[in-house]
């Protein structure tokens, strides 16, 4: 039970660091355009992150049963996975690098699971294809007929492909949306554009915060639920009194049907909001000031694009990176303005942080578990 409580504590600590680390992603543009002060923007982000965390548990379900084999997961393994992720978050936060908390979590989880399985690569669910039969309406006969569909999941479809495609979609979407706005607003006076989009950016910033909560807070829910599932399978809660039965969570064969306890949802939502309120000025400065000079219309375009990509990915249970999406959206908007508006030295630092996140956190998670095994703290 002590280990379960430790996992919950460390998972909430990860969520808290994710909150202040990723606060920058949801408010950088509204601060960079000077529509809100950092303090006002952080309070807005905290409120919208809290609201978003209560909507959509698809990402949590993917983390719980869609990435690694739960037979190789224990509370100790999860502590190692989370420790590596938290360390990476703090390191990149200290140096002001907008790396991915999502990929840090996935990397740490995969590395720890691999070590727990003593190098058995089957511990990681690389590709999963499930065929299911659904009833659809035949337009010719107007009758319901059986139709087979294939659902794709696993690391490749839920992490790797979205990891590559979401930044591209963010960049292209930001670029095209900004070009469209330029065409529509070409006869407007700059003063009018700034006034209108200064107000509109309050909505887009709130939308971004909501999408961030919907995507990132649910990852913590997945980790805690995974620990509870592992404890339930091990019979850890069999002798608990009835008033503690909420700790027992059975595993579902289908990740889409995995139960996420409501108390876990509430706990993670509040922790994410608290971490968001703590803020992350170092990364805000990188995104809002160093990459490209932003006006309210640019901030609106970047936030709307990024939030939409995040919301769609979250609805499909894909733990994509908020950082990747909003950063590339800002880059796309900057390139629509003029290519020279983009500062490539900053972009290179960000790219290096992206490339290193998955292997670095996977390596740390792996080594931590192997170290615990060497001291016989883990089987």
Spans of model-derived segments:
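Multi-pass alpha-helical transmembrane bundle typical of ion/small-solute transporters
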Residues: 1-379
